């Protein structure tokens, strides 16, 4: 039961973490592109 709960939490956090990293990288890219006039 505990293993299933942990696996569910991990599987739920992985996409959120990847999405957060992607959004952060995108925002930094946009900010750098705007500052590089």
Swiss-Prot record:
NCBIfam families assigned: PRK00665.1 (NF001907)
Membrane topology: Single-pass membrane protein
UniProt name for this protein: Cytochrome b6-f complex subunit 5
HAMAP family: Cytb6_f_PetG
Role of this protein: Component of the cytochrome b6-f complex, which mediates electron transfer between photosystem II (PSII) and photosystem I (PSI), cyclic electron flow around PSI, and state transitions. PetG is required for either the stability or assembly of the cytochrome b6-f complex.
Superkingdom of the source species: Eukaryota
Gene: petG
Single biological process term from Gene Ontology: cytochrome complex assembly
Keyword Cell cycle: no
Organism: Marchantia polymorpha
GO molecular function: electron transporter, transferring electrons within cytochrome b6/f complex of photosystem II activity
């Amino acid at each position: 039961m505990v293993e299933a709960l942990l696996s569910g939490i991990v599987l739920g956090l992985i996409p959120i973490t990847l999405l957060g990293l992607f959004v952060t990288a995108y925002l930094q890219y946009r900010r750098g592109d705007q500052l590089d006039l």
